[in-house]
């Protein structure tokens, strides 16, 4: 019984993760209320994104927010 429950949970999680991935809409960072950041040039401002910048956004600085590594991204 326990093995079947574990297998069911694992299959469900992987099924949802693989099924949702390609169909997820592009993030709307304007509505995200993200933390603002300043790029390396000191004048351009962007939004902190944990991990890497999403499509349509460009990298301008690597930074940390508390203990989360990420990038400061500006819209192209």
Swiss-Prot record:
Transmembrane segment boundaries: none
Keywords: Cleavage on pair of basic residues, Disulfide bond, Ion channel impairing toxin, Nematocyst, Neurotoxin, Secreted, Signal, Toxin, Voltage-gated sodium channel impairing toxin
Tissue: Expressed in acontia, a specialised envenomation structure laden with batteries of venom-containing nematocysts found only in the superfamily Metridioidea.
Disulfide-bond pairs as recorded: 37-72, 39-60, 53-73
Localization: Secreted; Nematocyst
Signal peptide: 1-19
Main location: secreted
Pro-peptide region(s): 20-30
Record's function text: May affect sodium channels (Nav).
Similarity remark: Belongs to the sea anemone sodium channel inhibitory toxin family. Type I subfamily.
Name by which UniProt lists this protein: Sea anemone sodium channel inhibitor type I
């Amino acid at each position: 019984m326990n093995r079947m429950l574990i297998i069911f949970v694992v299959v469900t999680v992987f099924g949802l993760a693989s099924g949702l991935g390609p169909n997820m809409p592009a993030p709307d960072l304007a509505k995200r209320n993200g933390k603002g950041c300043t790029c390396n040039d000191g004048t351009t401002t962007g939004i902190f994104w944990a991990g890497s910048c999403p499509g349509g956004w460009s990298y301008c600085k690597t930074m940390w927010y508390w203990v989360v590594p990420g990038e400061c991204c500006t819209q192209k």
